[in-house]
Amino acid sequence: MDDNQLGASSPEEGLTVAVTEIERSAAQLGWDRASTVYALVPTGELLELDELPADMRDQLESTWDHSPHTLTAVIQEDLPGTDLEETLAQLGWPESVLGAAVCTERVMVPPEVQDSAPEDPQEAVEYFANHPDRDEVRIVTGVLRSGESWCAVRTRSHDEDDEVAQGMNLVPGLVDALLATFAPAQARDVPAAGGCGCGSGGGGCGCGSGGCGC
C-alpha cells in the first residue's frame, strides 16, 4: 500500500497528489519494471475498516491530514489479463473505490521514426526498441470515478523530479481506458490502454521530453 498524504483541498488536488506520489515511488524503485494498477481510496474511509492491518493503520494515522480528499493508493495484485490493455478491460471497482491509477513504461521515438516503422505490429515493436533515437518513458495516469484525470510522464533520459511533465490529459488513451473501468459492465468499450501510439507491447510514443504530444 502506498500512502500519499501531502494534504488536499479538493478532489482534483487529491488526485494530483496521489499520481505524483505514485510516480516518485516508482522512480525510487528504478526502471524496467512491470505495469502496476492501483485503487484510489479516501484515507479516512480506509481508517474506518476494522480489518486494516495495525501497521498500516499506524502509518496512515500518523500522516493523514484529515482531509476527505486525501487518497491512499492501494496496489492491486493477482489481476486478470496478460497485458495492461486486457487487464483494464476486465476491471471493475466497488463503490468504495473513488479512483484508479496505472504506472507503466513505454518506448518513445521521434515522430519521423514512427512514420518509417514497419507496418507489421511485432516488427514495429522491435524496430522501436532497437532504434538509436529511442527513449523510455514512465507514465502514471490516475482518474476519479467522477471523471477527473491527472498524468505524470518521466523520460529515462531526463530522470529528475523537476523534469516530470504533468497534466490532465497527457495520455488520453490511458485516461479513457481507466475511466472505462468505472462504467457499468454492459456499457464498457475500453479503448487501447497505450494511448499516443504506446501499445501494450511497447510501441512508439509521440511524447516529447516536455510532455506527451498525444
Region locations from a protein language model:
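Solvent-exposed interaction surfaces and binding hotspots enriched for charged
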Residues: 2-10, 56-75, 181-182, 186-188
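Short linear interaction motifs
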Residues: 11-23
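Short, well-structured alpha-helical interface segments that form or flank functional binding sites
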Residues: 17, 34, 83
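N-terminal interaction modules that seed assembly of large macromolecular complexes
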Residues: 22-78
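Conserved short hydrophobic interaction patches
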Residues: 25, 90-94, 181
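Short, intrinsically disordered low-complexity segments
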Residues: 61-119, 126, 135-138
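Glycine-rich, aromatic-bearing surface loops/beta-hairpins
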Residues: 111-214
